[in-house]
């Protein structure tokens, strides 16, 4: 299934939240994609931010919002449509053991990629 050209998985979560199958800037579920500071919209190849955060277009200075405005939302800027960065509540729903079973995988699909695999207790769909 796709929205605005990007694939997603429906884990059957109570909220109806659909999760993208890969990270922003990634071409597959096993690709790291880009890294963003909170509220940043310019992706970086490394998770390490050296120097001045201004150079990374970090827009917050002490006024951290629980939900980003769309002009500060990397997912919305890069993927468009209704895509947005997950909220705290969406992460909590994903992590809730009533909804999913999660396992840390060290060599996913024999691609030397580690990460967490979520399997829905509702419809058995998976998200890596």
Q: Where in the sequence are the language-model features?
A:
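Conserved positions within compact, well-structured domain cores
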Residues: 1-128
